[in-house]
């Protein structure tokens, strides 16, 4: 009998501090940097984002999202066999954020825990990893989290990037099932594009060598993203023997409304099937897809039995898609 990985619970968390474009523009103006709500919205579709307080860590956000997902799943946290955290902004170089989440959740069953780092594709990469563990029969219940505090690596003197990113976390609980859940996944990377989206600094001998802030070549990312997102979505559809017309909802990485709508158009879908949270969340990297998924589940748009396409593209350069029957 075929064994599937099925989402049985979703959860998300946003820090309370919400910063609108007008508020951010006013803060930047004090530093002599010009921007406006109109400029930001026209280029990205973003109207607001959430920032964590200085003493709040990636694992703190992850735990809040995880608690909500576990509650929605209706299982005891001691039943978890594996914890995966997708993040590019971990609490420490090590231990992993996943291990910290395990500890903060009070889980003492010795379940496996590790991080997945694929930047904005991270949640799709982690979901695919969890899917394979469950299909193999190794694990039954897996917690998958995307959590980020990108406000810690934003250069607030660079208006082309500092207006785009926000903090947050989203999570799902996957469980082994005889009923189809995740139907197919597809993952790819091309390291030759590593320099178009990166944090070029590194730690050596107790000091940061190079820049500790995010760098992005926006035009290069845009051009590559629209191309690979269409291809990887079609790859996942082909693997599941489905057509794009059978997709009920598309949840792409919430980076830029123009990229999202461009992908939707290439797939021949209407914008009514596109789940959009980038306007209120900004780009939350690995957290964006599970955040959007949880919003759409909780507001009733996504229903059991519907086909949902998740897809992401991020630094590395990485990209991937997961097609599921919710």
Curated annotation (Swiss-Prot):
It is found in: Cytoplasm. Its main location: cytoplasm. The active site is at 120, 253, 283. Its EC number is 2.3.1.180. Catalyzes the condensation reaction of fatty acid synthesis by the addition to an acyl acceptor of two carbons from malonyl-ACP. Catalyzes the first condensation reaction which initiates fatty acid synthesis and may therefore play a role in governing the total rate of fatty acid production. Possesses both acetoacetyl-ACP synthase and acetyl transacylase activities. Its substrate specificity determines the biosynthesis of branched-chain and/or straight-chain of fatty acids. The last Arg residue of the ACP-binding site is essential for the weak association between ACP/AcpP and FabH. Homodimer. This is Beta-ketoacyl-[acyl-carrier-protein] synthase III. It comes from Ralstonia pickettii (strain 12J).
């Amino acid at each position: 009998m075929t064994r599937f990985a099925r989402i049985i619970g979703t959860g998300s968390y946003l820090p309370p501090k919400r910063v609108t474009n007008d508020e951010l523009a006013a803060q930047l103006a004090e530093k002599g940097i010009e921007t406006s709500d109109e400029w930001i919205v026209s280029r990205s579709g973003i109207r607001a984002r959430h920032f964590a307080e200085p003493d709040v860590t990636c694992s703190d956000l992850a735990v809040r999202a995880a608690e909500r997902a576990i509650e929605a799943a209706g299982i005891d946290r001691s039943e978890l066999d594996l914890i995966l955290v997708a993040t590019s902004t971990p609490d420490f170089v090590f231990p992993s954020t996943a291990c910290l989440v395990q500890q903060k959740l009070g889980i003492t069953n010795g379940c496996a825990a590790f991080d997945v780092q694929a930047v904005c594709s991270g949640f799709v990469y982690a979901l695919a990893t969890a899917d394979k563990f469950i299909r193999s029969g190794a694990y039954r219940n897996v917690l998958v989290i995307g959590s980020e505090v990108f406000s810690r690596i934003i250069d607030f003197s660079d208006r082309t990037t500092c207006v785009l990113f926000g903090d947050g976390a989203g999570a799902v609980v996957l469980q082994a099932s005889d009923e189809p859940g995740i139907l197919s996944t597809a993952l790819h990377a091309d390291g030759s594009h590593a320099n178009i989206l990166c944090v070029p600094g590194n730690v050596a001998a107790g000091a940061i060598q190079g820049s500790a802030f995010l760098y992005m070549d926006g035009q290069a990312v845009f051009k590559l993203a629209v191309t690979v997102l269409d291809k990887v979505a079609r790859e996942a559809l082909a693997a599941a023997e489905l057509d794009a017309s059978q997709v009920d909802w598309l949840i792409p990485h919430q980076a830029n409304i123009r990229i999202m709508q461009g992908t939707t158009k290439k797939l021949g879908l209407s914008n009514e099937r596109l789940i959009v949270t980038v306007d209120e969340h900004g780009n939350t990297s690995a957290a964006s897809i599970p955040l959007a998924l949880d919003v759409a589940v909780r507001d009733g748009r996504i229903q059991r039995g519907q086909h949902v396409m998740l897809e992401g593209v991020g630094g590395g350069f990485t990209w991937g898609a997961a097609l599921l029957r919710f």
